[in-house]
Amino acid sequence: FIFIYAPVCHMTWHPDGLLFKYGILDFAGGTVVHMTAGFAALAGALFLGPRTESERTHEFANVPYVIIGTGLLWFGWFGFNAGSALGVNAKAANAFATTNTAAAAAMISWVLMDAMRGNKISSNGACVGAVVGLVAITPACGFVNVGESIAIGAVAAAVSNMAVHFKNKS
């Protein structure tokens, strides 16, 4: 925490921070929270290496739990993003609305990408798309309007879907 998260917080939000000086905007911590977690996960995966053949069997997820979990995460994300406005005001309402629309647009985009590729449409895919939209909108939710949030969610889900397809194909 101290060696990874705190320096990134300083670089992003402190007026003397490196990223702050370059004009980086991060409303609700998407850069700080999601990038540090993503790089930590990448470091862990590189350290652990690929799975052995015996670990490659894929167990199916419990679909109702995935849907419930996604709904709870989506609901909690409203507090994460809208709460970053530090008040009940227009900025919080905008963050709430953009969070919801980005997640919904990403969910639809993910499902459409699967359908265009000829894959079976699944509720798990829709849930993954929603989470992609939530992550993508987090740094921008207080700075963009609803229309822009739809574009952010849809593009993020399309790019993520293609990346997952490419990863699974190779």
Predicted segments, located by residue:
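Hydrophobic alpha-helical transmembrane bundles of multi-pass membrane proteins
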Residues: 1-170
